[in-house]
Amino acid sequence: MTKDELCEALHREMLFYYFAQRETRLEIRTGESLISAVWRKMKPYADCGFPRPITEADIEMLCNCSFAGLFHYDLEKGAERIAQLEQELKSL
């Protein structure tokens, strides 16, 4: 993979990993859109070392993913994948 592809894979994995965190629940308030609720859930994680800033397209991608799959995301495997991608980036 190229450096750009690795950065994008890392960014995507981090989105899934932090979205799946149980400390912050996805709560949709009355009159609130799903996109706004996902933005609010992800906001605390924005400074967690993402390769690039979280964008509206990222939030839309999370909204279009299977939430059932994201809520059953394996955090341990995700952390391992993130570490692997970070190591690959460092070795470039």
Language model regions located:
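Acidic, low-complexity, intrinsically disordered interaction modules
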Residues: 19-83
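The feature captures the hydrophobic core positions of alpha-helical coiled-coils
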Residues: 6, 82-85, 89-92
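Short terminal alpha-helical segments
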Residues: 3-27
